[in-house]
Amino acid sequence: MKKTALLAALCSVVSLSSCCRIVDCCFEDPCAPIQCSPCESKKKDVDGGCNSCNGYVPACKPCGGDTHQDAKHGPQARGIPVDGKCRQ
């Protein structure tokens, strides 16, 4: 029983990490290639399966070595409010 529960938990973690989840829309990486935008991938995903964006993992970090302290990056670069709520 414990092995089954552990296996199920492990599979769910792996599947969550490999899918473009709708929650990623709040945290799109401004450096991401357009075709790997989590929101766009979710919209194009008609059959309900997972789209792993060819292994691309969204990340909130400055683009191209940008070191400006006041420059917006991560969610704020996409116009997402500081509180992290998704625009409807």
UniProtKB/Swiss-Prot annotation:
GO terms for molecular function: extracellular matrix structural constituent. PROSITE patterns: PROKAR_LIPOPROTEIN. Residues 1-18 form the signal peptide. It is a lipid-anchor. GO terms for cellular component: cell outer membrane. A lipid is attached at C19 (S-diacylglycerol cysteine). It is found in: Cell outer membrane. A lipid is attached at C19 (N-palmitoyl cysteine). One of its GO terms (biological process) is regulation of cell shape. The keyword Nucleus does not apply. Keywords: Cell outer membrane, Cell shape, Disulfide bond, Lipoprotein, Membrane, Palmitate, Signal. In elementary bodies (EBs, the infectious stage, which is able to survive outside the host cell) provides the structural integrity of the outer envelope through disulfide cross-links with the large cysteine-rich periplasmic protein and the major outer membrane porin. It has been described in publications as the Sarkosyl-insoluble COMC (Chlamydia outer membrane complex), and serves as the functional equivalent of peptidoglycan. Part of a disulfide cross-linked outer membrane complex (COMC) composed of the major outer membrane porin (MOMP), the small cysteine-rich protein (OmcA) and the large cysteine-rich periplasmic protein (OmcB). This is Small cysteine-rich outer membrane protein OmcA. The gene is omcA.
